[in-house]
């Protein structure tokens, strides 16, 4: 089972593109 890309793990905002890294997830 895979979660939506919205909740992919991250360590910085740059990983999320136009999203922000919050609590290790892109939102």
Swiss-Prot record:
Expressed by the venom gland. Its main location: secreted. The keyword ATP-binding does not apply. Keywords: Secreted. One of its GO terms (cellular component) is extracellular region. The keyword Secreted applies. It comes from the Eukaryota. It is found in: Secreted. Not toxic to mice by intracerebroventricular injection. Belongs to the u18-CNTX family. This is U18-ctenitoxin-Co1b. It comes from Ctenus ornatus (Brazilian spider).
């Amino acid at each position: 089972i895979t979660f939506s890309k919205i909740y992919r793990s991250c360590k910085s905002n740059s990983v999320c593109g136009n999203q922000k890294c919050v609590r290790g997830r892109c939102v």
